Amino acid sequence: MSDPGLVGVVGAGTMGSGIAHVFARSGFRVALCDVDTRFLERAMGQIRTNLGREASKGKLAVAEIELALERIVPTTERKDLARSAVVVEAAPERFEVKREIFRALDAILPEEAILASNTSSISITKLAAETRRADRVIGMHFFNPVPVMALVEVVRGMATSDATFAAVKELSERLGKTPVEVNDAPGFVSNRVLMPLINEAAFAVMEGVATVEAVDQVFKLGMAHPMGPLTLADFIGLDVCVDILRVLHEGIGDPKYRPCPLLVRMVDAGWLGRKAGRGFYRYEG
């Protein structure tokens, strides 16, 4: 039988650590699982830093920092997730990786447990088909930085039950998020609309229409965007953008989703954006 106070998170990268943070801050015990102890150590350090930042802004009592951290158990063993009522997968945006995780979790989780994916573009219906609990598979697409961003796209697969949707909607609200119902389609709403913008911005630079800075200024000053599309691409990660565009291109078939060759070359060069110190812009520290 599942433990209603225990949540599993698979993947201790930027998104996984942020998801673990908001669950722990909301009173849940969290099993944070990754195959690499270095990612787990980095995630725990980032969570501590972010909780401290919240406390310094008066959003969290200082005493709550240690309490929240104590609720998170980092682990490399998936068996430590076996009693979770909900598991949120936050692995890299590749179907083969997620499929293996879903199959493994389906084999060890209680029958009533919900399997959620933080995927930003991959089909929830396809992931659900890899399990024996398709009615209890759903998308929980959080946004980066997770502790700050209010939205969760709650994505219904073809077999997702009303009870599963209602449970995840309520869970999202307990985390202080606003859940928005979305049906399963490549990229859902967010990336189906956002990624063509980033892609066209990259084409504009590649074709010499404008500089990186000029493209971003057009959107910041002319359209009141808080940051330009290329700054945002660096923040998301250019490798993530290319992965999502490939999923969209394959799933929808429209050439507008074909990744800009400049984006692909930058990823090949290791210029992944802010996390790598270089993308469309250079970053220090």
What label would you give each PLM region?
Residues S2, A166, E173-D184, F203-E207, ...:
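NAD(P)-dependent Rossmann-like dehydrogenase/reductase catalytic/cofactor-binding core
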Residues A31, A63, R174-K177, N191-I198:
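Structural/interface elements that position substrates and couple domains in central-metabolism enzymes
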